[in-house]
């Protein structure tokens, strides 16, 4: 009898564990009505913006405004009190993202008087691939020296007269650049980055992750600017200072990545960077009902584009890739490349012939995009193992202009 009870108990435990494993979690974007209960003030911006950020605005005659005021903490606390977990927040959009496993919590959140909209932006995937715990062992840093100072990057530098700018002293010294991307795989071990002035890193997808173990895309983008190994690989801004910010979740393609990106952009503004490069863009998602349509490319419809359009008001120079959809059915630029006052960069080869994969414009309101073209065919970039490789994409055209 006792053995039977034991068997039943084990079965019940197994069923409970299975049900627990099947519990889905979701993330929702919540729009707030106002910032009425803020504890911050426009006349005391040093409470939420760094001295460097304020100096940048002062030099350009740009005022602090209500979008700079952080999201109301009291509103967030009330969401948490209903059972939601805070994931991210955006003061420019006056939104937060919360995570729940019980969707009835969202009904309670939506009923709050200061909430104007709620939208699901993420559903937990069935599995997440493990990161490479032995990534550092991949790095050999085996390189071949060139007679040219820029190494394999000499063509992409010369096409844009970057060598002339460097000779005149414009090598990025004194400038701060934020790179918002998918991850910076092995950038902490690759020799072309040794000596890079790194101001810091931040992961807006998962604060507990190692950005150097995530996707390699951001590392390759970074190498177009920050590489500084003479006769091997030298980038466009080798003496600049860098923030490495991860907003792309490589495991899924869901709208919440726009929220991560918006928060990363706001962080870059708050710490006082001068230039932001982002070689990311979205128009289709795992849930195809969330895909953008051409009529949405008005510079404001997507959360990313709305945030990007505000960057210039803060004194930021935002440079973004146009996208690589030229050969496909979409063909068009991808948000945030449709935003106003951002520099959207398409790809060309070393002879300045348009790359057929480079996304095209115009925007739905008739603005010409991309704004400029740069080398994005066979671009010299750092490889995952520290060698020098070549890659195609507007992702590498964009940083070549930074």
Short names for language-model regions:
Residues 1-24:
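Bacterial Sec-dependent N-terminal signal peptides
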Residues 36-37, 93-94, 105, 124-126, ...:
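Solvent-exposed loop/turn segments at secondary-structure junctions
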